[in-house]
Amino acid sequence: MEDDPHSDEEILEILKMKKIAVVGMSKNPDKAAHYVPKYLHENGYDITPVNPNADVILKKQCYDVITDVPDDVDIVDVFRPSDQVMPIIKEAIKKKPKVIWLQEGIHNEEAEKLAKDAGIDVVYNRCMLAEHSR
């Protein structure tokens, strides 16, 4: 899998955005889809879980899909396999975030192009926790 081309400076600018909807956030504390957003929450980010199989995670209400989130979102952080990203991107575009962040190991060129064509920046194959803690 190729590396994301964003510079360190670009990543730092993205990490200044504080409202994050986390698609695929897990209730299981052993999974990255739980402990990464938990870390971000503990470090000042406003996390909104998006998971149709949960009602509450980290004492925050979960939403079934990204467009159900009532507030504006700066970043849509995705914890789903690459082959499941396209419908998530299509839904996220409707929410008009500034950035869609595909976590480490996630890359879908077709879906990423769709987001970029809609004016949304896309980070892929990078972990927000790792980037924030550098």
Predicted regions and their residues:
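NAD(P)-binding Rossmann-fold cofactor-contacting core
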Residues: 26-30, 37-58
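Phosphate-coordination loops involved in phosphoryl transfer and adenosine-cofactor binding
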Residues: 16-19, 73
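Short N-terminal or domain-adjacent regulatory/targeting segments
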Residues: 1-16
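Short, charged, surface-exposed secondary-structure boundary motifs
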Residues: 57-60, 74, 110-113, 131-134
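A short helix->loop->beta-strand "cap" motif at the edges of active sites that frequently abuts
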Residues: 43-45, 95-99, 118-120
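Rossmann-fold NAD(P)-binding glycine/threonine-rich loop
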Residues: 104-132
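Mid-chain, well-packed structural core segment of small domains
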Residues: 66-104
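Conserved beta-strand elements of the Class I
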Residues: 21-23
